[in-house]
Structure formats: C-alpha cells, structure tokens
Amino acid sequence: MTRLRIDLAYDGGGFYGWAKQPNLRTVQGTIEDALHKVLRVPTDDAAEPLRLTVAGRTDTGVHASHQVAHLDVSDEVLNRCVGHMTIPVTEALTRRLKAVLPSDIVIHGIAVAPVGFDARFSALERTYVYRVADRSSEVDPRLRGCVLTVDEALDLELMNRAASLTIGLHDFGSFATPNPGGTTIREVKTAYWRRVPITPLVPDEMASHEAYRTPSLESGLVVFTIVADAFARNMVRSLVGSCIKVGSGRKSLEWFAGKMAEPVREGSSGPIAPQGLTLEHIAYPADDQLAARAEAIRAVRTL
C-alpha cells in the first residue's frame, strides 16, 4: 500500500464544500470519482475505497489556492495509470487526473508521502485569507466570485484591535459551530487586516500616452489573514463577520472582547458569506517530525 500526497487548488463557487455528500457536487466526491475512473476501480470496491483525507475541510462556496490531501492505494492499482507512458507513476496519475477533472479543480502535484505523513493531523498550521471590498475599494468584477462586497466604510484600526484579541490559545466557542465530542479550543498564531495599496496611475506606453491603472486585481481590497494550527467549523467566517461589525461601527470593540471572554455561540457572531474566503496554505514539519506531530494533534486540547 502506498500513501500519496496530493497538492491541489479549486474554485469553491460550484461546490457544496469539500466533504463528499450524496447527490451533491463536492470537491472530494469529484476527485474520488476521477480516481476511480483513471485507476479503473469500481466505486463499490470495498478493497480499494480510494478515499481522500484532507488537511482542511472547506465549506460550501469556500475556495482553496493550496489544499493538501492524502490517498492510500495499492501498488497494483496505482500502476494501472502508467499504461504506455515511460514516466514515474505519480506523474502519470497527475496527467490522467488533469485530463478528466473539471476546470475548477487543479492538481498541482502528486508525490509519494514520507513515512508518518497525514494530510490532516501532520499539518503545523493553516492560512486562510478573506477578501472584502468596502466603500473605499475599487472592485474588479473579475473577482466577484472570491470577494465579498460591503456597502460600508471600514475602520481597519478597530478591526485590527479586534483581530489581535484572537491571537494565542483560546476557546472560540462564540465563533464556531459546535462539534459534539470535539473542542473549539484553537491556537491562532497570526491575525490581521490590511488594505492592499491602490495601484498608482502610470503613463501608457502606447501611442495615446493616456494614464491607465496597472493591472492589480486586489487593488484597494481589505484583506484578512489568519494563521492557526487548526480551525473550528465556521470559525474564520464568524471572526470576519464580527470584525466587520466592529469596523463598520455596528458593534463595539468591547462586544468583540466579550465574545472572546465568554465562548457562547449565538446569532450575532454567526458566519459571513463564504465567497470571500480562501484556504491559502498548509504548512508541515520536517519529514522526521510528521508522525510525532500527527500523534500530538490528535489529543483533545484544553486551556
């Protein structure tokens, strides 16, 4: 049996999240169907389930520019994808998947995973970014599927004061959907808001010599970046929504601090729309630390 590491990206707008669900288009379901096709394994073959384990289970409408999954597959089945090609089996599988997957999923690479690697439990940290266009932003319509537009002027200083309260080990019960048997305790390493500088006008080099704006799709956007060891369900979107309420003046900084101090879930700190959120990066330790990391992270965290 071989464990493969799969690095991929996807536009989440057309999916009901990562996790496979009956009769719904999901990222996991789409890739697993493609694997069954290219490896010629029946979908009901219990001996070869071809089931993916993922680093971050994204929700409906959430994107990923860097996602990681692992797959356990027998050597006999894996070798089927080589066919007449004289290339490594991982490259052959990458090519065949790219040929059958839809354009909103991209496989960046497949490799044999190091010993002890677990896509979910070996991860050191995950980075999410949420993009917002407020009244001061220049909205590029090409980004409408991955940016949330709000008709408000946002105070980034207040929003950063709120975000700073999340850094460290906390119970994020006010900002997460309860998970029976799980915990909402997480360690946030970085959390901050910034506005992408608006691209200056520069002379056009063409004959008209008219000023034009250099192409920067994120010019003027308000961007939230958060890094943590792991995230509870809906945690990032709920934090973003609450920070926006503070930045727009609809809620006070004291209200946000109270939600952090008293981890009780209620409607005012619920998740904001998904389309602005992207899973940007998954980081892993050195190969010789993968197994130890996976064992440690499986333990239930306490404050």
Curated annotation (Swiss-Prot):
It is an enzyme of class 5 (isomerase). Coiled coil: none annotated. It catalyses: uridine(38/39/40) in tRNA = pseudouridine(38/39/40) in tRNA. The active site is at D59. InterPro entries: PsdUridine_synth_cat_dom_sf, PsdUridine_synth_TruA, PsdUridine_synth_TruA_a/b_dom, PsdUridine_synth_TruA_C, TruA/RsuA/RluB/E/F_N. Substrate binds at Y128. Transmembrane segments: none annotated. Gene3D superfamilies: Pseudouridine synthase I, catalytic domain, C-terminal subdomain, Pseudouridine synthase I, catalytic domain, N-terminal subdomain. Its EC number is 5.4.99.12. GO terms for biological process: tRNA pseudouridine synthesis. GO terms for molecular function: RNA binding; tRNA pseudouridine(38-40) synthase activity. Keywords: Isomerase, tRNA processing. NCBIfam families: hisT_truA. HAMAP family: TruA. Belongs to the tRNA pseudouridine synthase TruA family. Homodimer. Formation of pseudouridine at positions 38, 39 and 40 in the anticodon stem and loop of transfer RNAs. This is tRNA pseudouridine synthase A. The lineage of its organism: Bacteria, Bacillati, Actinomycetota, Actinomycetes, Bifidobacteriales.
